[in-house]
Amino acid sequence: MNDAFSTAQHRLDALGLRCPEPVMMVRKTVRQMAAGETLLIIADDPATTRDIPSFCEFMDHTLIASETTQTPYQYLIKKGL
């Protein structure tokens, strides 16, 4: 596991879920976080490779790291203001 992923303050397991469920769960989890906190998302839906980066851009969160070369995919996001 990438060192960046091991520093996450929150973790969300979205394995087995299909669009739009992973992004809906990310949104719900991020709402409960403070600005600046980080979330590790583990997913296996190929749609997340497009949806998670788009979600971050649209909602002003930062996609710190992603690993999408093999499943499970991993995403580390930092909550914006």
From Swiss-Prot:
The active site is at C19 (cysteine persulfide intermediate). The gene is tusA. One of its GO terms (biological process) is tRNA wobble position uridine thiolation. PROSITE patterns: UPF0033 (PS01148). Belongs to the sulfur carrier protein TusA family. The keyword ATP-binding does not apply. Keywords: Cytoplasm. NCBIfam families: PRK00299.1 (NF001423). The keyword Transmembrane does not apply. GO terms for cellular component: cytoplasm. Its main location: cytoplasm. Sulfur carrier protein which probably makes part of a sulfur-relay system. This is Sulfur carrier protein TusA. It comes from the Bacteria. It is found in: Cytoplasm. One of its GO terms (molecular function) is sulfur carrier activity. InterPro entries: Sulphur_carrier_TusA (IPR022931), TusA-like (IPR001455), TusA-like_sf (IPR036868).
